[in-house]
Amino acid sequence: MAKDIRVLLYYLYTPIENAEQFAADHLAFCKSIGLKGRILVADEGINGTVSGDYETTQKYMDYVHSLPGMEDLWFKIDEENEQAFKKMFVRYKKEIVHLGLEDNDFDNDINPLETTGAYLSPKEFKEALLDKDTVVLDTRNDYEYDLGHFRGAIRPDIRNFRELPQWVRDNKEKFMDKRVVVYCTGGVRCEKFSGWMVREGYKDVGQLHGGIATYGKDPEVQGELWDGKMYVFDERIAVDVNHVNPTIVGKDWFDGTPCERYVNCGNPFCNRRILTSEENEDKYLRGCSHECRVHPRNRYVSKNELTQAEVIERLAAIGESLDQAATV
């Protein structure tokens, strides 16, 4: 059956004059054609994911390609049955990718147009995965890695991308003298991060050109050596990559069983992304810890209108109580 919706993933590092006004004009156009999605605009470029029917997405691509400096912008296209977004957002930011460099010194930031790692095709990246002397580094957030990753890739001990530069500095001796290749969802983070590694003194740095999204669509590699699914920042949450021998690597936060279903912790002040089944979500009140389960603003409890007696009953079923010492 034909899929009626297209999802466009794209980015481009290119100087944008009067980027705030550009963002406002861009939003107006997107709304005028009924496009949905999320786009970031900065002085350094544009980064977005949008969705719509064939006609709408074609109008959008034609419009973007008509803009000065964006004639060759590369759209990565997925075909889906449903919209990937509910609304349309275009926001101006200082950067389309924030590296978390010291003192938020934007003048000291990396310009990928001047410094970036060598581009690797999907075939070249697959060869790097099979090379025991090459370090493969995942540059995404921890919850993205936990849902799916390249076989043998290093999972940095970080919660989010902004912590990665410091982690690399702390572990520099482990791979300073080795070939390092990095990857991310669509390539936008790696453009900047690989450039940062070059500036830090790494001599042989590569990046997967077009990211995981391109690797999964390549007719030669067909996503092989990817385990699990790829996390995406839209209503789909997870998409397939490996079309040769797919596997599940995600594990339920509570019992460790295979799982590819993400929810946010019920405690709004925690909001951690956790993998869990619907059964365990109900059982543990969608709280990633006891503290989050009993938090007075637990969203799962309020959404399901649970009484205190019902909360106490569910806590008792897992050996907990309202007044026990909190454990994180």
From Swiss-Prot:
Protein EC: 1.14.-.-
InterPro entries: Rhodanese-like_dom, Rhodanese-like_dom_sf, Rhodanese_C, TrhO, TRHO_N
One GO BP: tRNA modification
Active site feature: 184
SUPFAM superfamilies tied to this protein: Rhodanese/Cell cycle control phosphatase
Keywords for the protein's UniProt record, in alphabetical order: Oxidoreductase, tRNA processing
Pfam family, one: UPF0176_N
Signal peptide start-end: none
Enzyme class: oxidoreductase
Function comment: Catalyzes oxygen-dependent 5-hydroxyuridine (ho5U) modification at position 34 in tRNAs.
PANTHER family: RHODANESE-LIKE DOMAIN-CONTAINING PROTEIN 7-RELATED, THIOSULFATE SULFURTRANSFERASE/RHODANESE-LIKE DOMAIN-CONTAINING PROTEIN 2
Sequence similarity: Belongs to the TrhO family.
Protein name listed in UniProt: tRNA uridine(34) hydroxylase
